[in-house]
């Protein structure tokens, strides 16, 4: 019951993200999609990933989108025109996505896809008593720091390069950018900077 409710809310919220005319409402529905997804992950027993969804996507990205949309005064009429312009392309992409999903999900619950499997030689084995039960965090840490530690280091280096690149771009000096010298600005004597105008408006001392 809870799974059906959360799935339905996620689908409706995802539809309202692209259908809402107000950008702020779209971002709020976007946040609701991630809340429903976190609930689905909790039902699946993936508590760590559910918390990651809440912290990363809602706490950082969605809030950033919300502030950006609220700062930029976007006209609703312009958004409606843009949506109508790209509606055929988005429809084609949606049809391709559903076509791929029907062919990737080789499941017996889909009647259009007949499965050809030999189920007579399958044996059901209960592995719960044979292995030690690990939590999601322990399993992720074991895989991340043993088998995939090289890719973990590579991703860390990529993030480091991106951070250094952002700092270098902000500190790059060009001749076209006008900047103020703070030391010279503070050292100016304001009593000598006041100009005296005579009776002749063209003469300034």
From Swiss-Prot:
Keywords: Electron transport, Membrane, Mitochondrion, NAD, Respiratory chain, Translocase, Transmembrane, Transmembrane helix, Transport, Ubiquinone. It is found in: Mitochondrion membrane. Its main location: mitochondrion. Core subunit of the mitochondrial membrane respiratory chain NADH dehydrogenase (Complex I) that is believed to belong to the minimal assembly required for catalysis. Complex I functions in the transfer of electrons from NADH to the respiratory chain. The immediate electron acceptor for the enzyme is believed to be ubiquinone. This is NADH-ubiquinone oxidoreductase chain 6. The keyword Translocase applies. Belongs to the complex I subunit 6 family. Coiled coil: none annotated. GO terms for molecular function: NADH dehydrogenase (ubiquinone) activity. Its EC number is 7.1.1.2. InterPro entries: NADH_UbQ/plastoQ_OxRdtase_su6 (IPR001457), Nuo/plastoQ_OxRdtase_6_NuoJ (IPR042106). It is a multi-pass membrane protein.
């Amino acid at each position: 019951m809870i799974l059906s409710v959360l799935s339905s809310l996620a689908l409706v919220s995802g539809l309202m993200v692209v259908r809402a005319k107000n950008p702020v409402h779209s971002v709020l529905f976007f946040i609701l999609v991630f809340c429903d997804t976190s609930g689905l992950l909790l039902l699946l027993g993936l508590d760590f990933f559910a918390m990651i969804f809440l912290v990363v996507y809602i706490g950082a990205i969605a809030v950033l989108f919300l502030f950006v949309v609220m700062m930029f005064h976007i006209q609703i009429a312009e958004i409606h025109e843009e949506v109508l312009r790209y509606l055929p392309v988005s429809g084609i992409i949606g049809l391709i996505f559903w076509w791929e999903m029907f062919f990737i999900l080789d499941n017996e619950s889909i009647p259009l896809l007949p499965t050809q499997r030999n189920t007579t030689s399958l044996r059901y084995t209960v592995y719960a008593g044979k292995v030690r039960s690990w939590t999601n965090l322990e399993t992720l840490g074991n895989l991340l720091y043993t088998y995939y530690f090289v890719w973990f280091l590579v991703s860390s280096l990529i993030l480091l390069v991106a951070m250094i690149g952002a700092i270098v771009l902000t500190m790059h000096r060009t001749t076209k950018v006008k900047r103020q010298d703070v030391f010279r600005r503070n050292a100016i004597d304001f009593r000598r900077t006041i100009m005296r105008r005579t009776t002749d408006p063209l003469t300034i001392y």
